[in-house]
């Protein structure tokens, strides 16, 4: 086993430790919850088909609660000034970049993708948040950047 592989596996196991004894649930209305379904399942790594943690299955009630929470939060977010949205989205992107190695190693164990690919995916995700952060101040008025080959419009309705 190469030094890099051994090192990556050791670091991945450290990051995965927090999932071993804690069932991963849902994040609804600003809180972590195990939901109402009551059924959990093993999250198996494709590397060797062993359990790396447990995950709660979502129920119809959990989906309804998440949609209701999104609807409740929608007006507040829609009325948040573009400069504040920009700050929050950039802060989130900063956190993703700070934890890109952790995200890459955990996701690699979770889905079997190469670590280098998952790290780039995390960095790309952060770049997407930064792109929309930069657009937030100018989008506050419901307008968007015009391009001749596109028709742009805004629908202010939460979709979930």
Cite the ranges covered by each PLM segment:
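Terminal low-complexity tails and localization/encapsulation signals of metabolic enzymes
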Residues: 1-54, 87, 91, 139-160
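Glycine-rich loop-to-alpha-helix module at the N-terminal edge of alpha/beta enzyme cores
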Residues: 49-140, 149
